[in-house]
């Protein structure tokens, strides 16, 4: 039960971080309070950091909200491609 509660809290914090309702530092402090400063806490903080700096919602090479493509169309007129969590204009995946 405790593991399920921890996972639920973590997913809630990820949702809050990706919506930018709170800043990354406050969410990482909550992770320290709930999970602690151990290996699992470090992993959780790394995931929150990766999602918080994800500006165009690219997840695993997929443009979830089409914001990468929209950004690239406005900026350079080229198609936007997600490379992991980064958006690159006019550079398709080579694999």
UniProtKB/Swiss-Prot annotation:
InterPro entries: Long_scorpion_toxin_alpha/beta, Scorpion_toxin-like_sf. It is found in: Secreted. Expressed by the venom gland. GO terms for biological process: defense response to bacterium; defense response to fungus; killing of cells of another organism. Belongs to the long chain scorpion toxin family. Class 3 subfamily. The short synthetic peptide (20-54) has antimicrobial activity against the yeasts F.culmorum (IC(50)=8.8 uM) and F.oxysporum (IC(50)=10 uM), and the Gram-negative bacteria E.coli. This is Opiscorpine-1.
């Amino acid at each position: 039960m405790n593991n399920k509660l921890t996972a639920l809290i973590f997913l809630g914090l990820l949702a809050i971080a990706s919506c930018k309702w709170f800043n990354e530092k406050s969410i990482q402090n909550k992770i320290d309070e709930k999970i602690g400063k151990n290996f699992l806490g470090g992993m959780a903080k790394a995931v929150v950091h990766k999602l918080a700096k994800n500006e165009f919602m690219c997840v695993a090479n997929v443009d979830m909200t089409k914001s990468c493509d929209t950004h690239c169309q406005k900026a350079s007129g080229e198609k936007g491609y997600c490379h992991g969590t980064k958006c690159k204009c006019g550079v398709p995946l080579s694999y």
